């Protein structure tokens, strides 16, 4: 445990961030690869309806991520702050209650999703060509595998919060690699032709089950020397701690939920322009995840460090960690913008051979890539406020980003410029959000500095 404390308290900022962030980045990249692998393998069929169906289901899958954020981010941020404040027993109670609440919520979500499967698909814009494919994917990925996926992500966040970033990264990475291996086996060898979407979905489900099993084994192995545990025998956490879980977790979940709603609207609007446009848009939104997943990995490594030092009242180290994470994320995002704009046609061709989809996808990617640095800055700021327990600010920034800017701008640009307007929406909306975010950041920082001086 002393070694873990040195990472939080003593190591040079870049070294601490590297130790915490690199495993998270690797796991995020492998997660990205297996998500892209689904699209790539399905794209080998040259069937835009299959590709479009997977894109349609993505918002529901993201809803499950919002559940994992609710308890993984909310509980994880609080655990790191409790450890920084030397309250180990309370941190242990928070860990246990976070696990049980996430399990109950995940089971309820999977059941509701299956119960209202058809209305949900209609809401997402499914048509006669995509509905059956989307239903197959939804059943296995969310209906059966969703609980295991949520629990894996929650456990990953929680064990990272106590310094076990490497173990968290290995678990998520292992699941991703397994998914990539299972995809072609199930899609092209086990399941018959025409059921490639089902094969991809079953591969994802199985990898989620095995990943969850890994995390259970890890928790059993390290629980004696940490605050990790699922037993409620020591009692429930204080009422203030439960409120704190939700005060950070709800904004973290709502942030994903609002992004999900905006994505549903974008998909539905894009579907009006045809399956080819939707398939091209789906490929682009997968490809843009490379810099964003790296950025998310940086932020995941940043959160425990900032939360711990915030509670320990080491504001200078906290500020250095935040600045270091921001510089790294923006640099990577800018490099990806250059790469995507230069090789857009080759990138889209890698996923699908349909000429019309390639043409649209190339134009979409060249436009959409410019939003990447601004997207990173948006969620980097939200992660920062989650880390210091300022959930209300995170919530309102999420509302500003999606409700005030993204959705209205999307509707306006779609009405005026069609599919291309939808693609440019993210850049305009997130540039506006970044300006608002930094005004809020400097206001909060100045206010806290003034309070400290008094």
Region annotations inferred by a language model:
Residues 51-111, 149-168, 280-338, 342-344, ...:
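Small-residue-rich hydrophobic transmembrane alpha-helices
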Residues 18, 33-34, 71, 112-116, ...:
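Residue-level signal for transmembrane alpha-helical positions in Major Facilitator Superfamily
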Residues 19-38, 175, 207-211, 215, ...:
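Transmembrane helical elements of multi-pass membrane transporters/channels
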Residues 33-51, 121-128, 185-195, 257-290, ...:
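Helix-terminus/linker motif at the lipid-water interface of multi-pass membrane proteins
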Residues 1-21, 79-145, 192-250, 306-371, ...:
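Short alpha-helical transmembrane segments in multi-pass integral membrane proteins
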Residues 8-40, 44-45, 59-74, 78, ...:
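N-terminal transmembrane alpha-helices
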């Amino acid at each position: 445990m002393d070694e873990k404390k040195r990472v939080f308290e003593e190591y040079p900022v870049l070294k601490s961030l590297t130790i915490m962030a690199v495993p998270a980045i690797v796991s995020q990249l492998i997660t990205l690869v297996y998500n892209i692998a689904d699209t790539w393998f399905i794209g080998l069929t040259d069937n835009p309806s299959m590709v479009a169906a997977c894109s349609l289901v993505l918002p529901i899958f993201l809803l499950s991520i919002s559940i994992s954020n609710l308890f993984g981010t909310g509980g994880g941020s609080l655990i790191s702050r409790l450890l920084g404040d030397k309250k180990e027993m309370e941190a242990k109670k928070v860990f246990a209650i976070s696990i049980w609440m996430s399990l109950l919520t995940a089971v309820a979500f999977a059941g509701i999703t299956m119960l209202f499967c058809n209305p949900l698909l209609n809401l997402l814009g499914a048509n006669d060509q995509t509905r059956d494919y989307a239903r197959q994917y939804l059943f296995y990925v969310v209906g059966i595998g969703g609980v295991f996926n949520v629990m894996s992500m929650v456990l990953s966040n929680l064990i990272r919060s106590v310094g076990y970033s490497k173990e968290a990264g290995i678990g998520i990475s292992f699941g991703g690699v397994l998914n990539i291996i299972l995809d072609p086996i199930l899609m092209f060898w086990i399941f018959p032709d025409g059921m490639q979407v089902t094969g991809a979905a079953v591969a994802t489900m199985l990898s989620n089950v095995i990943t969850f099993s890994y995390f259970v084994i890890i928790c059993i192995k390290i629980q004696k020397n940490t605050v990790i545990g699922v037993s409620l025998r020591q009692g429930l956490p204080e009422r203030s701690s439960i409120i704190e879980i939700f005060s950070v977790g709800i904004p973290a979940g709502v942030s994903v939920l609002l992004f999900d709603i905006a994505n549903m609207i974008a998909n539905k609007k894009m579907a009006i322009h045809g399956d080819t446009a939707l398939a091209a848009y789906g490929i682009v939104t997968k490809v843009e995840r490379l810099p964003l997943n790296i950025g998310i990995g940086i932020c995941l490594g940043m959160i425990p460090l900032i939360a711990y030092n915030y509670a320990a009242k080491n504001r200078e180290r906290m500020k250095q960690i935040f600045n270091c994470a921001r510089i790294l994320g923006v640099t990577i995002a800018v490099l990806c913008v250059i790469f995507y704009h230069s090789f857009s046609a080759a990138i889209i061709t890698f996923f699908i051979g349909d000429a019309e989809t390639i043409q649209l996808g190339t134009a979409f990617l060249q436009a959409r890539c410019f939003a990447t640095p601004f997207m990173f800055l948006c969620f980097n700021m939200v992660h920062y406020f989650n880390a210091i327990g300022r959930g209300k600010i995170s919530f309102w920034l999420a509302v500003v980003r999606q409700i005030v800017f993204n959705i209205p701008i999307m509707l306006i640009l779609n009405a005026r410029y069609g599919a291309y307007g939808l693609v440019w929406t993210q850049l305009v909306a997130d540039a506006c959000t970044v300006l608002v975010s930094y005004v809020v950041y400097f206001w909060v920082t100045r206010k806290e500095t003034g309070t400290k001086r008094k």
